[in-house]
Amino acid sequence: MRVIASSIRKGNVIEQDGKLYVVLTAENIHPGKGTPVSQIEMRRISDGVKISERYKTTDQVEKATIEDSNFTFLYEDADGFHFMNPESFDQVQVPKEVVGNAAPYLAENMSVKLSMHDTTPVAIQLPQRATLEVVDTEPVTKGQTASSSYKPAMLSNGVRTAVPPHIGVGTRIVVMTEDGSYVERAKD
């Protein structure tokens, strides 16, 4: 499907020169003089190479047809990540480049959305929040409950984040999967 370059957004998949690219950033620039342009940074799905393209906002770009489906995460091995469609029980192998920064948040039997172009996985969407355990942080100091400063902590998945002073080792917390930021103490 052909669309104008100014309508391309982050997360879209573009087909260019027979290859698929996922859009990382898309910015429309309107200079004081001259023609408005769309600056698009994208990553080639096949090998992970990042490129930056500049189009006139009225240029036509081929947007790939993408289908989102629910999948369950099974396991990770040297070949990549393995997911199963819960309805058809078909298994799909997803390369590490496609999973990217989402890898630490994947847990066995976690439900995720996979974006597919034909039978090729091009993107993964995790649940917005994940519950993890704090495995290392500075000890709780009495009298720091009123302060709004955060302290560094290591989570059970190996990700570093900042937590409030009252959070100690062994506490289960909820974090945003997009950036690993602290949301709240888990209610379980």
Swiss-Prot record:
Among SMART domains, the record links this protein to: EFP, Elong-fact-P_C
Q: Key word Cytoplasm present in the record?
A: yes
Where in or outside the cell? Answer: Cytoplasm
InterPro entries linked: Elong-fact-P_C, NA-bd_OB-fold, Rib_uL2_dom2, Transl_elong_fac_P/YeiP, Transl_elong_KOW-like, Transl_elong_P/YeiP_cen, Transl_elong_P/YeiP_CS, Transl_elongation_fac_P
- Pathway recorded for this protein: Protein biosynthesis; polypeptide chain elongation
Q: What are the disulphide bonds in this sequence?
A: none
The protein's GO terms of the molecular function aspect are: translation elongation factor activity
Q: Which GO terms describe its biological process?
A: peptide biosynthetic process
GO CC annotation: what is one?
cytoplasm
Q: Which residues form a coiled coil?
A: none
Provide an example Pfam family for this protein: EFP
Q: Which domain of life is it from?
A: Bacteria
- Recite the UniProt keywords alphabetically: Cytoplasm, Elongation factor, Protein biosynthesis
Recorded family membership: Belongs to the elongation factor P family.
Query: What protein am I looking at?
Result: Elongation factor P
Q: Write down the species.
A: Rhodopseudomonas palustris (strain BisA53)
> What gene is this protein a product of?
efp
